Amino acid sequence: MIKTYDSNEYDVIVVGAGHAGCEAALASAHMGQKTLLVTIGLDMVAFMPCNPSVGGPAKGTVVREIDALGGQMGKNIDATYIQMRMLNTGKGPAVRALRAQADKWQYHEHMKDTIENTPNLTLRQAIVDQLVVEDGVCKGVITNTGAKYHAKSVVLTTGTAARGKIIIGELTYSSGPNNTTPSIKLSENLEKLGFKLRRFKTGTPPRVNGNTIDYSKTEEEPGDKTPRHFSYESKDVDYLKNQISCWMTYTNNGTHEIIRENLNRAPMFSGIIKGVGPRYCPSIEDKVVRFADKDRHQIFLEPEGRTTKEVYVGDFSTSMPEEIQLKMVHSVAGLEHAEMMRPGYAIEYDVVEPWQLKHTLETKNIKHLFTAGQMNGTSGYEEAAGQGLIAGINAALSAQDKPGFTLGRNDAYIGVLIDDLVTKGTNEPYRLLTSRAEYRLILRHDNADLRLTEYGHELGLISDERYEKFEEKKQAIRDAKERLHEITVHLSDDVQEFLKSIGQEPMKAGVKADVFLRRPNVKIADIERLTGEKIPGDRYVKEQVEIGIKYAGYIKKEETRIARLKRQEAKKIPADIDYEMIEGLATEARQKFEKIRPETLAQAERISGVNPADLAILSVYIQNGRYSKVKKYEAEDLKPSSYFAEKYGLEADAETGASQY
């Protein structure tokens, strides 16, 4: 038994320094709270044990949202990327996504340096084995060396280290990601505290030596020449010119045959793996089985940095035995002679069932305890970082006895992510997709600052200087819109010829420039050229104006739906409501309400298995005063009449049966 001793006191303690933990700790420190960030290994701060990239569909928007709120991930990747690309440029603005290839070592070093130089923030290497909980309130942590750190709030971001187990074929051993020390006792402690945990699984592909790849047999995927950034504070002049390409190749029938012949040795199919894996990031053996009609699968060869020869074999995740992995790799065009530097592996780990959380990411059964990241059942660095930021903000607010901060589904993809977790839970590693957002035309990559910077400034995460620039941008957008409304695009041969060149019908009369801009494929630059007028604002301002005008009708429809959502969100459900008292609820709805404890009628509406009739009954019960009547009887120890008891399921007065309300 290790003897404990009282160490330092903090306002907030963050356990785990992955992408969630870094954002949580930085947010807390920037909000003026004395913060301790504890990690199993200092060499794993903001480490990328899987794909060396940031962004992509939905995920890239999350990174922009983190930056708009005052988080660090966007700045960190802008300082350490080796390639930047905008995806889905041929599609509408709702699904465009920025993706950066990271130098994973520089990313880690830059984030660690940021943390080490942030006031109010202490970084320490230790393994947390136990929480200090008194009267249902978390008051600190105890490490494996016996140090007891006291705090007003605690954030857990254990990632895949929580009782982690690595699996490579028949080989299994206790480990965190990338062969790091796992966290065992903390999971056991959480179970003793009453938390429901479950096992998830994720995996990573082999890494090969870039010097042994025959790139002539692959297709080059270069970065964008047009400057792109995740952070709104990054400048075009700093955009990286000397980018490193990724490369694309494919599996083939030979690859698939090797996999099929060895499925009996695949842990996924042999029964060794018990945890549930990610549906949207399956292993290559899973893809070969599930999509047997496909004769090839895409593979991306992604450099892991400027100073390493390691290349990540993307979309080739596997837990096959090492000897089989070698055969699989060598069957792929361009990789016939590739040297494998690290084998792929699967890792099983513990997650907290996320329905045990509030939207602030505070746990429901222990106050001042927050969880974030893969620990909550998500997959991906970006989802983790977004949760970490919200958990860190709320831990800091909780430490000051201030009300919590939440984002709605209409505010941000981060809000969609957290609401899905808290309201629906998840039976598999959760990945954020654009299709999960009902209001994705409003939750765009380009307007995250317009949606969230106000919040970041109010929370103290956005400086006054940055906020002033944000206000200037908003004014520039207004000025550009006004100028477009003032300018007239007159009938002319140049205008008609231009319309013909883009496949548009000719004009019959002159129109205002903002009306002309509504036509497909018309840009503000075209209006400036055709009219000789200058529209104020930089390219980011003009992008906002173009999207706002072109999609005005669709945006208005989404805003109407959001207004209805807000009305439902305003209808709060009392925290101590007893669903057994509500007559007429379906059994499934009653059980779901009791398990999830929705905070508003809007959240109740989103719970799977709940039908409109159940919602109507719940709404009437709350709004017609029946809830308050029930609470009155409880408070005054009154017994209702037998009629009232029969109708609303209360205990009647046995002596008189008289009405007492």
From Swiss-Prot:
Pfam families in the cross-refs: GIDA, GIDA_C_1st, SAM_GIDA_C
Region of interest: Disordered: 206-230
Binding residue positions for FAD: G16, A17, G18, H19, A20, G21, V128, S183, Q374
Regions of compositional bias (Basic and acidic residues) in chain numbering: 216-230
Cysteines joined through disulfide linkages: none
Free-text function comment from the UniProt entry: NAD-binding protein involved in the addition of a carboxymethylaminomethyl (cmnm) group at the wobble position (U34) of certain tRNAs, forming tRNA-cmnm(5)s(2)U34.
Identification of the protein by name: tRNA uridine 5-carboxymethylaminomethyl modification enzyme MnmG
Source organism (scientific name): Lactobacillus helveticus (strain DPC 4571)
Gene behind the chain: mnmG
